[in-house]
């Protein structure tokens, strides 16, 4: 039986959505604005130039990105718990894809916050290939493959758990539609990265990155609205019966 919007799982979904929302805002516009204002990293020309321009504040988007990762997995887990029998298997598959997302992105952010900074701070010609391979400043780095395929896995996860939201009012139905849309959008981004490495740092890639951030913001905001409005409606109905 599907759990109601007043269960701990529903409250967890709201909390997870708030954490995810904070992660999107802090790791995206807030962190990027601070980095660009204080110590921007110039366009990639090579590992040596990257090391010269490196500053610890450039890791801020990745540290705050852990909020997004944790919040997103927590949200999918909460929705899987709320799934009724008809959607339980699908939602459980979504949780598995969310776990794959977390593994890929968390590994990438550990590399960006710990491994790459150590290489840049103690730069030597021997470390140049590793910086080029992993730093997200390099549009053709392995880091971008991890990033895009990781978020592709999250897209599959949101696609899978979307039906859980559909019976939580208008906000829930809209959120479900956006959760579904995030699936092919994220998968397309991963495939494009495989076919055209480096596209993420082109004007089109940066524009799509901004659009995806907006999509994610609206998605998680609607989750908060859906569960809060649904819970309020249940409280009003209960009061009326009393």
Spans of model-derived segments:
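Hydrophobic, aromatic-enriched alpha-helical segments typical of multi-pass transmembrane helices
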Residues: 2-242
């Amino acid at each position: 039986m599907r759990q109601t919007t007043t269960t701990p799982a529903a409250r967890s979904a709201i909390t997870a959505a708030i954490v995810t929302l904070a992660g999107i805002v802090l790791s995206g516009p807030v962190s990027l604005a601070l980095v660009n204002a204080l110590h921007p990293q110039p366009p990639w020309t090579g590992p040596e130039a990257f090391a010269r321009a490196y500053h610890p504040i450039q890791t801020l988007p990745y540290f705050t990105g852990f909020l997004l990762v944790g919040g997103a997995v927590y949200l999918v887990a909460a929705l899987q718990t709320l799934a009724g029998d008809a959607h339980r298997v699908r939602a459980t598959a979504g949780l598995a894809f969310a776990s794959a997302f977390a593994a890929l992105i968390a590994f990438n952010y550990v590399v960006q916050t710990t491994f790459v900074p150590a290489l840049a701070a103690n730069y030597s010609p021997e470390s140049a290939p590793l910086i080029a391979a992993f730093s997200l400043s390099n549009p053709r780095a392995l880091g971008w493959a991890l990033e895009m395929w990781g978020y592709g896995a999250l897209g599959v996860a949101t696609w899978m758990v979307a039906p859980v939201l559909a019976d939580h009012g208008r906000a829930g139905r809209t959120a479900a539609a956006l959760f579904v849309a995030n699936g092919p959008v994220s998968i397309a981004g991963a495939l494009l990265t495989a076919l055209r490495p480096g596209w993420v740092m082109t004007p089109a890639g940066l524009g799509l990155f901004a659009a995806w951030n907006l999509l994610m913001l609206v998605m998680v905001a609607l989750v908060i609205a859906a569960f809060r409005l649904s819970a309020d409606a249940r409280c009003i109905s209960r009061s009326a019966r009393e």
